[in-house]
UniProtKB/Swiss-Prot annotation:
Signal peptide boundaries: none
Record Gene3D superfamilies: Ribulose bisphosphate carboxylase, large subunit, C-terminal domain, RuBisCO large subunit, N-terminal domain
Stated role: Unknown. Probably does not have RuBisCO activity.
InterPro entries: RuBisCO (IPR033966), RuBisCO_lsu_C (IPR000685), RuBisCO_lsu_C_sf (IPR036376), RuBisCO_lsu_fd_N (IPR017443), RuBisCO_lsu_N_sf (IPR036422), RuBisCO_lsuII (IPR020871)
Matches recorded under Pfam families: RuBisCO_large (PF00016), RuBisCO_large_N (PF02788)
Name of encoding gene: rbcG
Family: Belongs to the RuBisCO large chain family. Type IV subfamily.
Natural source organism: Symbiodinium sp. (Dinoflagellate)
Classification lineage: Eukaryota, Sar, Alveolata, Dinophyceae, Suessiales
GO biological process: carbon fixation
Protein name per its UniProtKB record: Uncharacterized ribulose bisphosphate carboxylase-like protein
MF annotations from Gene Ontology: magnesium ion binding; ribulose-bisphosphate carboxylase activity
More about this protein: Only found in Symbiodinium A, a minor symbiont of the giant clam Tridacna gigas.
């Protein structure tokens, strides 16, 4: 059914639509199937996105979506959707993002005359945005006592996906936190190997002990992937009840649009860690249908989550491209500078970008330089636990390379390349040097000549470590002996007065403060007795 006269108007002025504020503008890459006219297919696409090509009438015309721009050669199509199309809540009158998704990203992308269609940007007018909610909790740096902005790297999320039992998980969390990392994540939730009723109390013990020892806030991201709102509510309340005074440091880890909105409403005071569940199936550069990663992230901003995975511009394992930088910048700025038009956020609070995907210390400096800052949450499970000297050294190395990047940027090493600056920094920082030996393939690609510069030509590279119970800490015997002799007995006694529920880790423990220089960041986490106590308690 030819509907271009009703659902297309190529004379429509985009600037005028922006001024009147009555349309949501959506930009697509769309290709008709062979033999179909581009404009006719675009009009059919618009019709099925709104009032319907076969059931419309003149009375519905004010609600018609209109194709206002096409370029058949570049396969670009833009549609203006009247804001009156979108559903709103009965309870408070707010517009529904779900309604926008249904119309703009619905089944139109797979119609009989459409080869593919993919959204690469959209614009929401102020009238639509003002009917959305801003997060009750802003960026996570306040939680970690790092200031409201420019908080720097919050590194080291550990997220075992299956099979780690409660006590090893507690010990691993403790080791990572003691290494200067701020975050652990529990995506196991209530799986058979680690029931929530057993696992969460163990993490609480680790956080309590670590915060007491370092006087530095830590964060735990509790898995709250559920099918039902009641289950989400029950899990969230249970976790918060267990953490008690540390409940403000708990994050609700959710996946999917509905879950993000539900978590925000149910737990308005908690930081919402929003995971783009299955995002690669739609937002990967290899996918011709769905929407780009930029669009997915923009939607998360609209539903007012407080953080979202922003990928790593191909510095990690996940496919990415230059728009990934735009994603991270958009989450932290008051406006999104995009391909379609500038999106003002109307005072919505900032989001915190999360980067993940097999990142390690060696890959971070170039990522920071490309992004222009280091204000991200890093999940570096393999980068921390894969380090040859264990998770603490892996976490310390991630913090150290941030310092190395800042030192290079400030001109401390003169007119040298970033890679040479990091190598120079590594000469006096054993954890980074250990990362070079642990990840030699990355080292060879990013830091040519590193072996000669670091004097490692005679040293064999070592395989990444695997996390096993016996390797929570790989502190040398000499370091352990030093820790034993320097430990203040009175402090140890005071730490142990509350019993194992407060401080289950005994033995040679030397704490550090993340604000200290990386020269003081090297630490002995657990003596041999401490490791055994951590595993057997």
């Amino acid at each position: 059914l030819e509907q271009s006269s009703r659902y297309a108007d190529l004379t429509l002025d985009e600037a005028g639509s922006l001024r009147n504020g009555e349309h949501v503008l959506v930009a697509y890459i769309m290709k008709p199937k062979m033999g179909y006219d581009y404009l006719a297919t675009a009009a059919h696409f618009a019709a099925e996105s709104c009032t319907g090509a076969r059931s419309t009438d003149d009375a519905k015309e004010s609600a018609n979506a209109v194709v206002y721009y096409i370029d058949a050669d570049s396969q670009e199509m833009r549609i203006a959707y009247p804001t009156v199309l979108f559903d709103s809540n009965l309870t408070d009158g707010r517009d529904m993002v779900r309604s926008f998704l249904t119309l703009a990203i619905g089944n139109t992308q797979g119609m009989e005359d459409v080869e593919f269609g993919k959204i690469y940007d959209f614009y929401l007018p102020p009238s639509f945005l003002r009917l959305q909610e801003s997060p009750s909790v802003n960026t996570m740096w306040r939680i970690l006592d790092k200031g409201a902005s420019n908080g720097g790297l919050a590194a080291g999320a550990m997220k075992p996906k299956l099979g780690m039992q409660p006590k090893p998980f507690r010990a691993a969390s403790y080791a990572l936190w003691q290494g200067g990392a701020y975050t652990t994540a529990d995506v196991q939730a209530n799986q058979a190997p680690t029931q929530a009723s057993e696992g969460i109390p163990e993490v609480v013990k680790a956080m309590r002990s670590c915060v007491q020892g370092t006087d530095v806030a830590k964060r735990h991201s509790g898995g709250n992937y559920t099918d039902e709102p009641k289950e989400m509510d029950a899990r969230g309340k249970y976790v918060l009840s267990q953490f008690g005074p540390f409940s403000g440091n708990c994050v609700s880890l959710v996946a999917g649009y509905a879950a993000g909105g539900s978590a925000r409403h149910t737990f308005p005071r908690q930081f919402v860690h929003y995971h783009r569940a299955g995002q690669a199936s739609t937002s990967s550069p290899q996918t011709q249908r769905g929407y780009s990663a930029f669009v997915h992230t923009k939607i998360s901003q609209v539903i007012s989550t407080t953080s979202i995975h922003a990928d790593t511009m191909s510095f990690g394992k996940t496919q990415g491209d230059s728009p990934d930088k735009s994603i991270a910048v958009m989450l932290q700025d008051d406006a999104a500078d995009a391909r379609l038009c500038n999106q003002e956020w109307e005072g919505m609070r900032q989001n915190a970008p999360i980067i993940s995907g097999s990142m390690n210390a060696l890959r971070l400096p170039a990522f920071f330089e490309t992004l222009g800052n280091s204000n991200v949450i890093l999940t570096a499970d393999s980068g921390s636990f894969g380090h040859k000297d264990g998770p603490a050294s892996g976490a310390i190395a991630c913090r150290q390379v941030e310092e190395a990047w800042k030192a290079w940027r400030s001109g401390q090493y003169g007119n040298v390349s970033l890679s040479d600056g990091v190598v120079e920094f590594a000469k006096t920082h054993e954890e980074i040097k250990g990362a070079f030996l642990t990840f030699p393939k990355d080292a060879d690609e990013i830091y040519p000549g590193w072996k000669e510069k670091l004097g490692c030509t005679a040293e064999a590279s070592v395989p990444p470590a695997s996390f096993v119970n016996a390797k929570i800490s790989t502190a040398s015997s000499a370091a352990v002996a030093t820790a034993r002799t320097t430990m203040n007995a009175a402090k140890m006694a005071s730490q142990s007065t509350a019993g194992s529920a407060v401080n289950p880790y005994t033995g040679g423990l030397k704490s550090i403060h993340p604000a200290s220089s990386s020269n003081t960041a090297r630490t002995v986490l657990l003596s041999r007795q401490g490791r055994e106590a951590a595993l057997q308690d």
